[in-house]
């Protein structure tokens, strides 16, 4: 099959180009620009790479950044105090807390501490509630937004489509299920306790995989007309990463597929920055 590999980087670059123009307009009109605060706890190598990429892309479109790098040994209450400082800083448009956090920190308390109006990641319970209630307000998790944008690019009319999401995380599975329901898909969420997974995924028009298990889903899990969205990022050797789908053996057996890297990762960052711009616009009532 020719040209069935989805170039997430190219799609993300289109979004970034639009954001750059929009931010240039802000600067001319208001003499201000968005600013994203990134809270990084500890020195997890993978987290540091993700943060570096977010900062790089932010600067490319004209978003200022503030990196708040804190000790692994910080207490939950002290981290909340730091987040409250950022909440009160009128120069900060959006705030994200890089996950995962050390096990000693209460993640739910931290995500709830971020002001909902500055919640660029869309993880605050209020924003989660808006999404699942179908209220067009607040912020939606970036990876879920990125997945939906890719799906709609290749299947503009989702009415009645069968979508299967493998993985039930708060970052991908649950929010994406809400978004696809709003697009009138019939949505099935599968997880580690699902029996006969391939019998479910092989009937789907759209399969999104986000389980954190390298090369887990092979060709028999999909039908030839499927759009396959691979959200997994797994390090399988010192210098190689792979998704949750056996890409090399699946790519010729499906209609469209996202690669890893170069698929959903760039789209996630693009929508993080898009959320930050949205927060900035809301704050100054543009």
UniProtKB/Swiss-Prot annotation:
CDD domains: NAD_bind_m-THF_DH_Cyclohyd. Its EC number is 1.5.1.5, 3.5.4.9. NCBIfam families: PRK14171.1. Catalyzes the oxidation of 5,10-methylenetetrahydrofolate to 5,10-methenyltetrahydrofolate and then the hydrolysis of 5,10-methenyltetrahydrofolate to 10-formyltetrahydrofolate. Pfam families: THF_DHG_CYH, THF_DHG_CYH_C. GO terms for cellular component: cytosol. One of its GO terms (biological process) is methionine biosynthetic process. Pathway: One-carbon metabolism; tetrahydrofolate interconversion. Homodimer. PANTHER family: C-1-TETRAHYDROFOLATE SYNTHASE, CYTOPLASMIC, C-1-TETRAHYDROFOLATE SYNTHASE, CYTOPLASMIC-RELATED. Keywords: Amino-acid biosynthesis, Histidine biosynthesis, Hydrolase, Methionine biosynthesis, Multifunctional enzyme, NADP, One-carbon metabolism, Oxidoreductase, Purine biosynthesis. NADP(+) binds at residues 167-169, 192, 233. Transmembrane segments: none annotated. InterPro entries: Aminoacid_DH-like_N_sf, NAD(P)-bd_dom_sf, THF_DH/CycHdrlase, THF_DH/CycHdrlase_cat_dom, THF_DH/CycHdrlase_CS, THF_DH/CycHdrlase_NAD-bd_dom. HAMAP family: THF_DHG_CYH. The keyword Ligase does not apply. The lineage of its organism: Bacteria, Pseudomonadati, Pseudomonadota, Alphaproteobacteria, Rickettsiales. Belongs to the tetrahydrofolate dehydrogenase/cyclohydrolase family. It catalyses: (6R)-5,10-methylene-5,6,7,8-tetrahydrofolate + NADP(+) = (6R)-5,10-methenyltetrahydrofolate + NADPH; (6R)-5,10-methenyltetrahydrofolate + H2O = (6R)-10-formyltetrahydrofolate + H(+). This is Bifunctional protein FolD. One of its GO terms (molecular function) is methenyltetrahydrofolate cyclohydrolase activity.
């Amino acid at each position: 099959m020719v040209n069935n590999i989805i170039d997430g980087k190219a799609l993300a670059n289109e979004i970034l180009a639009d954001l750059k123009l929009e931010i240039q307009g802000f600067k001319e009109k208001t003499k201000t620009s968005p600013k994203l605060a990134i809270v990084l706890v500890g020195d997890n190598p993978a987290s540091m790479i993700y943060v570096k990429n977010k900062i790089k892309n932010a600067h490319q479109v004209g978003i200022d950044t503030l990196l708040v790098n804190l000790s692994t040994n910080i207490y939950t209450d002290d981290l909340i105090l730091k987040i409250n400082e950022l909440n009160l800083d009128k120069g900060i448009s959006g705030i994200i807390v890089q996950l995962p956090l050390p096990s000693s920190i209460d993640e739910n308390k931290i995500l709830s501490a971020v002001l909902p109006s500055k919640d660029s990641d869309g993880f605050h319970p209020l924003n989660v509630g808006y999404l699942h209630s179908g209220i067009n307000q607040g912020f939606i998790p970036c990876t879920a937004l990125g997945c939906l944008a890719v799906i709609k690019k290749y299947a503009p009319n989702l009415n009645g489509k069968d979508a299967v999401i493998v993985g039930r995380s708060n970052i991908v599975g649950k929010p994406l299920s809400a978004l696809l329901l709003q697009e009138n898909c019939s949505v099935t969420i599968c997880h580690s306790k699902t029996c006969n997974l391939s019998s479910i995924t092989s009937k789907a028009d759209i399969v999104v995989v986000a389980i954190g298990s390298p090369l887990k889903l092979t060709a028999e899990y999909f039908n030839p007309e499927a759009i396959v969205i691979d959200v997994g990022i797994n390090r399988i050797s010192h210098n190689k990463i792979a998704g949750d789908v056996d890409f090399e053996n699946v790519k010729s057996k499906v209609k469209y597929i996202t690669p890893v890297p170069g698929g959903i990762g760039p789209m996630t960052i693009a929508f993080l920055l898009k959320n930050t711009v949205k927060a900035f616009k809301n704050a100054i009532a543009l």
